[in-house]
């Protein structure tokens, strides 16, 4: 990955262990790419929050109050957008939980990402560990949306969790409103997903200044 210290003795030349050991406490922000009151992806996000391992806290970074982005705002950023970018800065990593609309991400999520990237040169996702997950009734739930989203995050220079991929097939009653997961296999997958993302966060916990 560009900018990281290199070591020819490890695969791909990337030396992660120089960034410090596992963090004892992590705060992970999550963005739900839907503003629907009945969103199953919001229930998935609540499940992740409920399943967070010891020492990890998940907090929502809301997007519903962001206005439509326009370059006209760059000279005078609205406070809601300032707060949104600060919320991203304040967490150790971000999980984006996205539905799939018309084989891509919802407009409300794209709008939030545009705010995060502006003004030019002040991208809130630069070197921010990020993970993508989503659920739908399909066996490859939200796969097309996630590919588009990962392309955006790559442009943002955001280290993004590669494996496991978060394609969760939703069935009636799988997620309760409070985040309860009724299927043990799904709960186990989500727990492993959070652990893998925690490992990614740890690798970037002490990236040298200026990287």
Q: What is each residue range found by the language model?
A:
Residues 37-40, 69, 104-105, 141-142:
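Secondary-structure boundary/capping motif
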Residues 24-55:
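N-terminal beta1-alpha1 ligand-phosphate binding loop
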Residues 63-80:
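N-terminal beta-loop-helix "entrance" segment that forms/cooperates
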Residues 23-24, 29, 159-211:
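Glycine-rich phosphate/pyrophosphate-binding loop and the adjoining helix
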Residues 76-157:
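Helix-loop-strand module that forms the ligand-binding subsite of alpha/beta enzymes
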Residues 53-59, 158-160:
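A generic structural motif
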Residues 8-22:
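Short, Lys/Arg-enriched N-terminal segments with co-localized hydrophobic residues
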């Amino acid at each position: 990955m560009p900018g990281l210290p290199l070591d020819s003795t490890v695969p791909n030349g990337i030396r992660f262990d120089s960034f410090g050991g596992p963090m004892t406490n992590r705060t992970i922000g999550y963005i739900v790419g839907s503003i629907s009151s009945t969103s199953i992806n919001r229930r998935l996000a609540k499940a992740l929050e409920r399943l967070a391992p010891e020492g990890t806290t998940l907090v929502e970074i809301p997007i519903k109050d962001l206005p439509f982005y326009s370059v006209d705002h760059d000279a005078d950023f609205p406070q809601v957008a300032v707060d949104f970018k600060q919320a991203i800065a304040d967490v150790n990593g971000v999980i984006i939980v996205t539905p799939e609309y018309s084989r891509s991400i919802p407009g409300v999520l794209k709008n939030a990402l545009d705010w995060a990237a502006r003004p030019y040169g002040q991208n809130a996702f630069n070197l921010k560990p990020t993970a993508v997950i989503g659920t739908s009734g399909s066996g490859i739930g939200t796969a097309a949306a996630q590919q588009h989203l990962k392309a955006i995050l790559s442009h943002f220079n955001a280290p993004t969790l590669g494996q496991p991929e978060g394609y969760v097939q939703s069935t009636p009653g799988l997620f309760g409103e409070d985040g309860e997961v009724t299927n043990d296999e799904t709960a186990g997958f989500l727990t492993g997903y959070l652990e893998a993302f925690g490992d990614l966060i740890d690798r970037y916990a002490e990236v040298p200044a200026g990287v």
